[in-house]
A protein has these predicted regions:
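Periodic aromatic/glycine/histidine/acidic cluster detector
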Residues: 1-134, 139-157, 163-231
Length: 231
């Protein structure tokens, strides 16, 4: 038997128009059980579960029109298992796998058309293994390999027409030999198609972060630290 202070309590908050904004349950001031947040139009924004203040089990977030935005699973308040995000048109955006909160295994990023944009491999949260990026026309944009989050082996970047743009070899993150760059001003390397993001080694990290920028409602839909303290 729970004492009065140990009973699970339901809390519902409303927006200025009287629509339900958030429905949650707490036990001893910590989130416990089902949690649901809503858009102003009544559609569910996110639906997940808590145990002792931490996220636990399956979780789903949605766009305002009801389309699924993200699907994931949590264990001990950390992402664990498959994570899939979607564009508003319903196409998959990202497919990832987590182990105890860290990326592990293959990461795949797609264009809105459903074509593959990027494939990477992770181990214990670090880049480890081959990776490859594509232009929208299907041409390889860049490829290489990482070992323990450091470049290792051959790196090649291409123009959209398939000609080599950059080429280099790395060992344990350090350049070995010359870094070769082939000028776009060479008529053979020009392409009259629409411009896309440049592919250079210097831009690579920013491109990777941009490609993975998903509005992760699972991380930002509430201040969980405050919730756990019962504020």
């Amino acid at each position: 038997m729970f004492s009065a202070k140990e009973k699970i309590e339901e809390e519902v908050t409303y927006d200025e128009k009287g629509q339900v904004k958030e429905r949650k349950f707490t036990l001893k001031g910590k989130l416990e059980g089902e949690y649901t947040s809503y858009y102003g139009n009544g559609q569910i924004m996110a639906h997940l579960y808590f145990r002792n203040g931490g996220r636990e089990g399956d979780a789903v977030s949605y766009y305002r029109d009801g389309q699924i935005r993200e699907k994931a699973a949590f264990r001990n308040d950390k992402l664990d298992g498959d994570y899939v995000s979607y564009y508003e048109n319903g196409q998959q955006r990202e497919i990832e796998h987590y182990n105890d909160g860290k990326l592990d295994g293959r990461y795949t990023l797609f264009f809105t058309t459903g074509q593959t944009r990027e494939i990477e491999n992770f181990k214990d949260g670090k880049l480890d293994g081959d990776y490859i990026c594509y232009y929208k026309n299907g041409q390889v944009k860049e490829k290489g390999r990482f070992v323990n989050d450091k470049r290792d082996g051959e790196y090649i970047a291409y123009y959209k027409n398939g000609r080599i743009r950059e080429k280099a070899t790395f060992k344990n993150g350090k350049l070995e030999g010359k870094f070769l760059s082939f000028d776009i001003d060479d008529p053979a390397n020009r392409d009259n198609g629409p411009e896309e993001e440049p592919t250079t080694l210097a831009d690579e990290d920013n491109l990777r972060e941009t490609g993975k920028m998903v509005d992760d409602l699972f991380r930002n839909l509430a201040n969980f630290e405050k919730e756990q303290k019962g504020k």
